[in-house]
Amino acid sequence: MTTEQPTARLQRVDSQPENPFSALIEDQSIVIIPTFTLESGVTLYNVPVAYTTRGTLSPSGDNALVICHALSGSADVADWWGPLLGGPGQAFDISRFFVVCLNSLGSPYGSASAVTYKDGNPEKGLYGPEFPLTTVRDDVRIHKMVLDDLGIKQIAAVVGGSMGGMLTLEYAYFGKDYVRAIVPIATSARHSAWCISWGEAQRQSIYSDPKYENGYYSFDEPPAAGLGAARMSALLTYRSRNSFESRFGRNVPDPSKRQNINGTERLPTPPNEHWAIHNDGHKGNWSGRNSPAPEKPAEKTEVQYMDPQFSGTKTFSKSVSTTDGNAQKRPATYFSAQSYLRYQGDKFVKRFDANCYIAITRKLDTHDVSRHRARPDSENPVREALSQIQQPALVLGIESDGLFTFEEQKEIAEGIPDSRLKRIDSPEGHDAFLLQFEQVNQYILEFFREVLPDIMSKTPTDGAAIDGVGKLTKSSTFGEAEVEDITAW
């Protein structure tokens, strides 16, 4: 439920016709900022910022709870952190808090980005690859303009994971009189060389797609192969080796869920069988000039069926000659882990834009809380910058996180004077903060009760309730939680 406040003065729009991705988010508002100068010095005009609100702002405007989304997230908190959102007993209690989530610049989900008009002018066309570099600091500054327009005088707490954790840390520098508490989760004080390198590899996947066209592609012909490959690469950094091994091992997928990337598949019949195995999963055109000509086998059957994961996608079972006695002796060449990655890649390209992916990953690269905050000769600039954060902080980390390591969470907690570090127990890796709802919910609730007693002690409008998360009823579009059994792939 999006709640408009009577104090709002800036213009709002209900839709963004040029951007097909913004329509994926229900019940969001888009506010237009007349002018905004980025950290780089570039000035944008008529800047859209998408956001959602839930709950009621207190008369004194001091019960706002700001939630910050991750790289591919949106302003729809209910989608990716839904089990934490609700009433008493849930961390994001809308009977106590006015919950606000704002979309970051560069994202395709409503805020200014590659898929919105330049300066809001249809005659200028879309930004495309000409959308300027934005930083995490740009996000929090423009978001504050929206929060001010909503009548928010003080933020009770800011919570965010991954990229959202970066925004959470930056919010703290507005000072303790404006932001009372922060909860950075599975994030970093500055983007590491490891993360920068993964972002570069993912961008190169997009650049290598012939359909990328230097960023001047159409919505009808996007670089889907490159973006899908980037997503697969990213997903491996979001999970852990042990997570994939326990879920998939060397399982062979159910044939009915085999991912058909090209619409139809060449049957692996002699003489093209080896070629087909070699190119399995390639998203290019199967009819290359050097591909072998099909040859009719002695006997074969072709079974057409509908892939249950992709409505309307036709796939065909593989067939081999019935006279081939060695078929059962051949090793498996297609595994459940591959099937799952292809499924995730295909799902992602339907909801995200390649130029936006490039823009957001470059935004992450700029993140460094010590920039312009530490002395030039400082021996530990990050520690010096973190020491300036005055709010109480709850830092949540994941031991199995190979992307934003637990050591990085310790660095944050050790640098912030009034902090406490808690561990999310999970083998799932980085994405555990979007999967382990019970643990995240309990840690945040305990922290809020400690540092926000005036808000948490109020009798909620819905009455008392036992601590606990809501039930996950559908797979997340913008997060990682899934209701289906992914081990079936």
UniProtKB/Swiss-Prot annotation:
Keywords: Acyltransferase, Amino-acid biosynthesis, Methionine biosynthesis, Transferase
Region Disordered, annotated ranges: 247-272
Keyword flag Transferase: yes
Domain AB hydrolase-1: 63-435
Location of the active site: S162, D401, H430
Gene Ontology biological process: 'de novo' L-methionine biosynthetic process; homoserine metabolic process; methionine biosynthetic process; methionine metabolic process
EC number: 2.3.1.31
InterPro entries: AB_hydrolase_1, AB_hydrolase_fold, HAT_MetX-like
Reaction catalysis annotation: L-homoserine + acetyl-CoA = O-acetyl-L-homoserine + CoA
Stored Gene3D superfamilies: alpha/beta hydrolase (3.40.50.1820)
Pfam families in the record: Abhydrolase_1 (PF00561)
Molecular functions (GO terms): homoserine O-acetyltransferase activity
Pathway involvement of the protein, from the record: Amino-acid biosynthesis; L-methionine biosynthesis via de novo pathway; O-acetyl-L-homoserine from L-homoserine: step 1/1
Superkingdom of the organism of origin: Eukaryota
Biological role stated in the UniProt entry: Commits homoserine to the methionine biosynthesis pathway by catalyzing its O-acetylation.
Family (UniProt): Belongs to the AB hydrolase superfamily. MetX family.
Cross-referenced NCBIfam families: homoserO_Ac_trn (TIGR01392)
The protein's name in its UniProt record: Homoserine O-acetyltransferase
Gene name per UniProt: metE
